């Protein structure tokens, strides 16, 4: 499938399924801890500076943000999890919103689960991966911020992440940097193979 990534726009933000777009365009959701680099990942894939707003303030995305890409594909930016400065009630609300989308959305083809290559996955990262595996949702695991680690240490960090997640070798694992564009083609290949 040919996709013109320049033809991309934010379509809408939704709090529940009554607000989701009503059509059959395939969707790829993006999930990860606050400040893992989701917005930078989206902007890099779409070759845009700030289509997805990057923020120094974690926990900025509080709704599901739907990005229309060439009327052929949508990215769905899921609120970042694991941010402590949000009330427990607010976190539970986000949790329900995310769970509703991931378990009931027929358009969903796969989830790009983002983790920070520099650190072991958090308990929230592990829980998200287990959740996706439990519901049999295809996963593309993207380890971000690869430029912050010397290339010679990538394998060591990759192995540590896979071990902590009990990673399924049938899932895609991509080392990614929005700075150097490492992993850009691999990410698109993985996404397009799912739709």
UniProtKB/Swiss-Prot annotation:
Domain called EngB-type G: residue spans: 24-195
Domain of life, source organism: Bacteria
PROSITE patterns from the UniProt entry: G_ENGB (PS51706)
Gene Ontology CC annotations of this record: cytosol
Any single Pfam family the record assigns to this protein: MMR_HSR1
Molecular function as annotated in GO: GTP binding; metal ion binding
Cofactor: Mg(2+)
Alphabetized Gene3D superfamilies for the sequence: P-loop containing nucleotide triphosphate hydrolases
Keywords for the protein's UniProt record, in alphabetical order: Cell cycle, Cell division, GTP-binding, Magnesium, Metal-binding, Nucleotide-binding, Septation
Binding sites annotated in the UniProt record for GTP: 32-39, 59-63, 77-80, 144-147, 176-178
Annotated family: Belongs to the TRAFAC class TrmE-Era-EngA-EngB-Septin-like GTPase superfamily. EngB GTPase family.
Role, per record: Necessary for normal cell division and for the maintenance of normal septation.
Protein name: Probable GTP-binding protein EngB
Organism encoding this protein: Streptococcus sanguinis (strain SK36)
